[in-house]
Amino acid sequence: MELDKETQEKIQELQSYEHTLQNLLMQKQAFQFETNETENAINEVSKSKEEVFKIVGSIMIKTDTEKISKELKQKLEHLSIRLKSIEKQEIELTKKIEELRDEVMKKIK
């Protein structure tokens, strides 16, 4: 079956959107993993009664519990904002993909 140029372009655009969505989902997964790690670190620091250490580069240094707690909470807040942004992009991109897929399917039939 021979497709017209417009349909071929829409198919390429659809493939591009799907590739972008796949990359976005990988980013989302990485941020979710980092969020879980940060939440676990916050929990461990809050229940620790011993000294707390922080890895900086290739060394480990002793740090203040309150200071590291504050840093981790700020990091968690930043991750949360980034995740919300990614989720918004994901919704918009998914909607575009569905619309474009419908258009292409109508042209093919």
Each model region followed by its residue ranges:
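Short coil/loop "hinge" linkers that interrupt or connect long alpha-helical coiled-coils or helical hairpins
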Residues: 43-68
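N-terminal or membrane-proximal amphipathic helix/coiled-coil initiation segments that transition from
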Residues: 1-12
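Amphipathic alpha-helical coiled-coil segments
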Residues: 10-31, 35-38, 45, 72-100, ...
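Generic structural signal for short, solvent-exposed loop/turn connectors between secondary structure elements
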Residues: 1, 46-50, 107-109
